[in-house]
């Protein structure tokens, strides 16, 4: 029997059927586009499903393919077995020949038998066939073509040999070809109690689609019968290379040996299984990424992440301290890139994703393994790990459940799956309750639906400024849409992961750009919903964007750097405020903008000029000391024990980020920060004010904005010097002299106004209006100082005993009312009551003062024409 390479097996299969008038159809994407119920393409027939059902037509009636396939989810979830058994894989190639109404059973069996025994030269006595127990036609074909007796044709009664597409639709019996590895391998023929052994291996499966299932009780013959076959490339190659384990074929051995040269650990013992896991998962991960799947916390992205993290854990077991997977990619591309050019085209992209994911997971892997070791120290063989701990590993450390199962497998420790699911449901319920009344009631359900379907957005921005991300949702006018086509449309975009920071913890969201194949998008803000969904506020600038598109997300680096500078400065400021103002100071709120920072604190009095100077000096000293800024992940409990300050407005998980700046500042924070305090440059407080009882607000600028502030103030100073015709040395004296002169002029002007408003008794008697024995003087005077009006009104009422004076000044929407009443008549006409009545009439809220002199405000200047009538009514009614 000739020995073939993997590439030769694939090539010979395709060439054989092409020679027999089959059209070579390229492999489809691993993402099924015609079957939303399917996670991944897992067989060769998937791309022909609609052809078999008659929904679509192809320009050919026979086809041959080498289809890349993945089985790692749903009923095909064999992940825990991959690497440990001889034949389980997450990624494999399925060779297949298909007939759509052309040939049927006899020709299909002939093609298979001829290829195996003549082209691949397999010994006939090593081959067996299975058929469905009622398929006498297939039995006759095998006897005729292969010369098999009844002892070589095994009749199977179970559904293993009857295939259906679903409850209804095309279906039919199967015939499988088995190869005998020899009696030195344990196992028995199909249908026997030893069938699960590795001696007899299925190498080819033929489905004879001859029926249509109408309902559970009705099955009819199809007018057009079809053939669907599948041969696992890896299995067939193992047979042709005289090995019983798929991982011993040339393709896997090339990857495994290449890996060994990097990690320097011999391929023996337990390490052998780790090498196999890495080789298999490298293929699955690379091909999935090439077809547009990106690791995430939901759907296909989560399956990919599970595969990648399992491989990374095995790399860790081999002692690999640095990211490994991306270093193996060139070997895979070299081996398979010519057959699958999409792998070669996407090589740099795949490499970035592999490296990014491994860097992210590496930090939590060791801590998660430490926790798992501690929690299982007392467990014995056959014991069960609690669902609570399994969930903590999943939720806090990113351990997929099957990764934890895989780790415990060799110790024969199982997991409490029911307890795990209970923890998962409890977390979802807590999340919903925590956000009740959050102010997002109108769109709460939309965000909950997104989170339920897609999970949380993974934030990449701690280490990356740009990344390839997949768009999972688009929102316009509070509604989910499938695409955005109109230029300049504003909308929200959600992706599986992003380098954009969503506004939280006081730090404003990032801005930047998103470039997809057919679109340019401007990101004008980044928001966060339900604590973990990052939404990009976007404007479409070019083309159109669709759900499912992959795109390059790139933040505005300068904008982010300014946010980092001001955010790190708030941490230093917080620590210094404790030192200067006292330990009573607590943070009440903050805003980190790219151009300034705002920090609200609990403090009962104004911060003095001397204190502000001291605060600035100490903050700038810490900046100049250029302390390293370190970020550490730890449990909330450990952080509290270390005395870490929690920041206002943050929601903390069981694992938190602790930001440390030298020995000065130690805080919990999810924001982005500088690498060293010196990166801040400089710090300057621009204002200090009260915003509520016992709460002060400090605003400040950092870095280049301090320089900008100095220049603005210098420019202002120059302008004042020029206006006052002096220099900075004489400026204070000149300003004081000017202010003093202004006071003198104001006094003179006040005297002038008072003199103008003053009346003699005779003038009062002549100008006042008599209403029921009471004199009234009413004037509307534009833009005169209230102080002057009070004095003038009081002067007049002091001269006579029966006078009411009303002055109204101001314009537009701000009016000031002054009322004075002679003391002799205040028991009947109270100035406060009159002022209040007039204020309410003019759209104000009342006033205050004394019975003889009161003031109030108003806003409705249009009613001034009716004031006299209002006064007349009030006086006559009293």
Curated annotation (Swiss-Prot):
Check the record and name the InterPro entries matching this protein: aa-tRNA-synth_II/BPL/LPL, Ala-tRNA-lgiase_IIc, Ala-tRNA-ligase_IIc_anticod-bd, Ala-tRNA-synth_IIc_core, Ala-tRNA-synth_IIc_N, Ala-tRNA_ligase, Ala_tRNA_ligase_euk/bac, DHHA1_dom
A Pfam family annotated for this chain is: tRNA_SAD
Tell me which UniProt keywords the record has, alphabetically: Aminoacyl-tRNA synthetase, ATP-binding, Cytoplasm, Ligase, Metal-binding, Nucleotide-binding, Protein biosynthesis, RNA-binding, tRNA-binding, Zinc
Enzyme class of the recorded protein, top EC level: ligase
Record EC number = 6.1.1.7
Q: Which cofactor does it need?
A: Zn(2+)
Q: How is the cofactor bound?
A: Binds 1 zinc ion per subunit.
Q: Which residues bind Zn(2+)?
A: 567, 571, 669, 673
User: Would you kindly state one Gene Ontology biological process term found in this protein's UniProt entry?
Assistant: alanyl-tRNA aminoacylation
Q: Name one cellular component (GO) term.
A: cytosol
Q: Name one GO molecular function term.
A: aminoacyl-tRNA deacylase activity
UniProt lists the family membership as follows: Belongs to the class-II aminoacyl-tRNA synthetase family.
Query: What is the purpose of this protein?
Result: Catalyzes the attachment of alanine to tRNA(Ala) in a two-step reaction: alanine is first activated by ATP to form Ala-AMP and then transferred to the acceptor end of tRNA(Ala). Also edits incorrectly charged Ser-tRNA(Ala) and Gly-tRNA(Ala) via its editing domain.
What is the designated name of this protein? Answer: Alanine--tRNA ligase
């Amino acid at each position: 029997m000739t020995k073939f390479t993997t590439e030769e097996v694939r090539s010979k299969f395709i060439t054989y059927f092409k020679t027999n008038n089959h059209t070579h159809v390229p492999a489809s994407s691993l993402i099924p586009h015609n079957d939303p119920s399917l996670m991944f393409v897992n067989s060769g027939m998937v791309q022909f499903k609609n052809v078999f059902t008659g929904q679509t037509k192809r320009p050919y009636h026979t086809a041959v393919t080498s289809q890349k396939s993945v089985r790692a989810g749903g009923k095909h979830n064999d992940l825990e077995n991959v690497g440990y058994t001889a034949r389980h894989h997450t990624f494999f190639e399925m060779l297949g020949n298909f007939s759509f109404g052309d040939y049927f059973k006899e020709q299909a069996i002939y093609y298979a038998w001829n290829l195996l025994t003549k082209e691949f030269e397999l010994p006939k006595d090593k081959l067996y066939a299975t058929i469905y127990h009622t398929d006498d036609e297939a039995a006759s074909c095998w006897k005729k073509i292969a010369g098999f007796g009844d002892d070589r044709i095994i009749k199977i009664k179970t559904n293993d040999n009857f295939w259906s597409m679903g409850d209804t639709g095309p279906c039919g019996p199967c015939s499988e070809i088995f190869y005998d590895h020899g009696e030195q391998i344990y196992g028995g023929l199909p249908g026997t109690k030893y069938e699960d052994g590795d001696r007899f291996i299925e190498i080819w499966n033929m489905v004879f689609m001859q029926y249509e299932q109408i309902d559970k009780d009705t099955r009819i013959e199809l007018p057009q019968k079809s053939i669907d076959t599948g041969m696992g490339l890896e299995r067939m190659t193992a047979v042709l290379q005289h090995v019983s384990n798929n991982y011993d074929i040339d393709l896997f051995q090339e990857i495994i040996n290449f890996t060994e040269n990097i990690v320097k650990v011999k391929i023996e013992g337990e390490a052998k299984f780790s090498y196999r896991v890495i080789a298999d998962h490298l293929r699955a991960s690379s091909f999935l990424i090439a077809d547009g799947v990106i690791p995430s916390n939901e759907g296909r992205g989560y399956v990919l992440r599970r595969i990648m993290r399992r491989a990374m854990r095995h790399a860790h077991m081999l002692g690999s301290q640095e990211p490994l997977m991306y270093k193996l990619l060139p070997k895979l591309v070299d081996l398979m890139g010519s057959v699958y050019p999409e792998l070669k085209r996407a090589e740099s992209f795949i490499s970035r994703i592999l490296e990014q994911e491994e860097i992210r997971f590496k930090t939590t892997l060791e801590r998660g393994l430490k926790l798992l070791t501690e929690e299982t120290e007392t467990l014995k063989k056959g014991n069960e790990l609690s669902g609570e701990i399994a969930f903590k590993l999943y939720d806090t450390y990113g351990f997929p459940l099957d990764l934890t199962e895989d780790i415990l497998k060799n110790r024969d420790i199982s997991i409490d799956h029911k307890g795990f699911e209970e923890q998962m449901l409890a977390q979802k319920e807590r999340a919903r309750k925590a956000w009740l009344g959050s102010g997002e009631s109108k769109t709460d359900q939309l965000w909950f639906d997104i989170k339920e379907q897609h999970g949380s957005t993974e934030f990449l921005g701690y280490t990356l400024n740009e990344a390839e991300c997949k768009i999972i949702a688009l929102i316009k006018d509070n509604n989910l849409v499938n695409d955005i086509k109109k230029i300049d449309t504003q909308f929200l975009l959600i992706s599986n992961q992003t380098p954009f920071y969503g506004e939280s913890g006081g730090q404003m969201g990032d801005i930047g750009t998103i470039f997809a194949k057919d679109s340019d998008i401007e990101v004008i803000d980044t928001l966060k919903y339900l604590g973990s969904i990052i939404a990009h506020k976007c404007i479409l600038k070019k083309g159109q964007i669709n759900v499912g598109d992959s795109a390059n997300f790139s933040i505005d680096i300068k904008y982010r750097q300014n946010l980092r500078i001001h955010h790190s400065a708030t941490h230093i400021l917080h620590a210094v405020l404790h030192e200067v103002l006292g330990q009573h100071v607590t943070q009440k709120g903050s805003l980190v903008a790219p151009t300034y920072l705002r920090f609200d604190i609990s403090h009962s009095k104004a911060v003095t000029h001397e204190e502000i100077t001291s605060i600035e000096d100490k903050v700038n000293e810490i900046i100049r000391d250029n302390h390293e800024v370190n970020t550490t992940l730890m449990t909330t409990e450990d952080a509290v024990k270390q005395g870490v300050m929690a920041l206002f407005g943050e929601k903390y998980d069981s694992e938190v980020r602790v930001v440390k700046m030298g020995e000065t500042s130690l805080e919990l924070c999810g924001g982005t920060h500088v690498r060293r305090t010196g990166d801040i440059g400089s710090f300057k407080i621009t204002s200090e004010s009260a915003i509520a009882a016992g709460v002060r607000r400090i605003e400040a600028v950092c870095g280049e904005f301090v320089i900008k502030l100095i220049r603005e103030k210098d420019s202002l100073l120059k302008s004042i010097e020029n206006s006052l015709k002096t220099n900075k040395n004489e400026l204070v004296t000149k300003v004081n002299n000017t202010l003093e002169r202004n006071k003198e002029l104001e006094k003179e002007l006040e005297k002038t106004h008072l003199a103008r408003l003053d009346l003699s008794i005779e003038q009062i008697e002549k100008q006042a209006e008599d209403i029921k024995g009471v004199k009234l003087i009413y004037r509307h005077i534009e833009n005169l100082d209230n102080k002057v009006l009070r004095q003038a009104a009081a002067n007049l009422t002091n001269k006579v005993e029966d006078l009411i004076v009303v002055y109204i000044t101001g314009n537009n929407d701000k009016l000031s009312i002054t009322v004075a009443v002679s003391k002799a008549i205040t028991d009947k006409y109270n100035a406060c009551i009159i002022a209040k009545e007039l204020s309410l009439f003019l759209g104000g809220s009342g006033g205050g003062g004394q019975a003889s002199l009161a003031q109030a405000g108003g806003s409705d200047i249009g009613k001034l024409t009716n004031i006299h009538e209002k006064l007349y009514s009030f006086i006559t009614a009293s």
